[in-house]
Regions:
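Acidic/polar, low-complexity intrinsically disordered N-terminal segments immediately downstream
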Residues: 1-65, 232-240
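Short, surface-exposed, charge-dense and proline/glycine-enriched linear segments
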Residues: 16, 22, 27-29, 96-109
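Short loop/turn segments at strand-loop or loop-helix junctions that form parts
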Residues: 28-33, 79-81, 108-113
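Alpha-helix initiation/capping motif
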Residues: 44, 64, 119, 128, ...
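Auxiliary, metal-adjacent structural segments of Zn-dependent hydrolase domains
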Residues: 48-105
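Active-site recognition of the HExxH zinc-binding catalytic motif
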Residues: 104-162
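Metalloprotease/metallohydrolase-associated module, dominated by Zn2+-dependent proteases
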Residues: 163-240
Length: 240
């Protein structure tokens, strides 16, 4: 079932029900000692409307066809209680997943789910502005990363002015005043699976494309005032 939110300009079909279990598991991970398979539930009408509004206002509202061409998959599943189930012999462990983007045919977003009976963890739909920021951020950063990879977003030549990608950096607490401290060198840090920055621990883990992506993430994650308070421009001019 295709949602009315689907815009053909983005080339993706948003699907929220009649998803078969096999659809989640076209690619299996694991094997040997343990294996993992993916599960999720269809949305009801109220949930579908909430997800639809979320994608319209917090994802597609920040995109255009030039960015998403060759980036988004044909299908995007919006589901409830998406999780990986790991099997260890006769034992099974559930791991909640808010998104999945490692398949060429489909991606998945899950905004809420059941309580994990073992860990009591639970995905809860966003309510505050900070919640929405984090939810849309993890999706948009994946889209922008892939857009850079396929060439839809090109790093401007002038972006690398003053940034040294060869000399090793420092990152540990207590070295913030060192000239080679990564933020002083023009590296805001690096985002992995969450929408928060981690320390950049080696210059070998960064290149112009990856660093440019981090600046895109930086612009989404913080306001100018928030980042000034966190990383004063008087101390870290290269990241401003």
């Amino acid at each position: 079932v295709l949602l009315s939110v689907t815009l053909w300009e983005f080339g993706v079909c948003m699907i929220y029900k009649d998803i078969e279990e096999g659809d989640y598991n076209r690619s299996w991970t694991g094997g040997g000692v343990f294996a993992a398979e993916f599960h999720g539930q269809d949305l009801n009408d109220e949930q579908a409307q909430f997800y639809t509004n979320f994608f319209k206002n917090h994802v597609f509202n920040y995109l255009n066809a030039e960015i998403t061409q060759k980036v988004l998959p044909p299908y995007y599943y919006m589901v409830y209680d998406y999780h990986a189930l790991y099997s260890f012999g006769t034992m099974q462990l559930k791991s909640e997943m808010s998104f999945y983007t490692d398949n060429l045919d489909f991606w998945v977003t899950c905004l809420e789910g059941d309580v994990n009976p073992l860990t009591f963890a639970q995905l809860v739909r966003p309510k505050t502005s900070e919640d929405y920021l984090m939810c849309r951020g993890v999706i948009l950063k994946e889209i922008f990363e892939k857009a850079i990879e396929v060439g839809n977003i090109v790093v401007p030549e002038e972006f690398n002015t003053g940034i040294d990608y060869q000399t090793e950096i420092t990152y540990k607490v207590g070295y913030e005043n060192d000239d080679n401290y990564y933020v002083k060198r023009g590296f805001p840090g690096i985002m992995y699976t969450t929408f928060n920055f981690s320390d950049l621990q080696s210059v070998t883990k960064i290149n112009p494309q990856t660093n440019f992506l981090q600046y895109i993430n930086l612009g989404m994650r913080y306001t100018k005032e928030e980042y000034e308070a966190l990383r004063p421009s008087s101390k870290y001019p290269l990241v401003h």
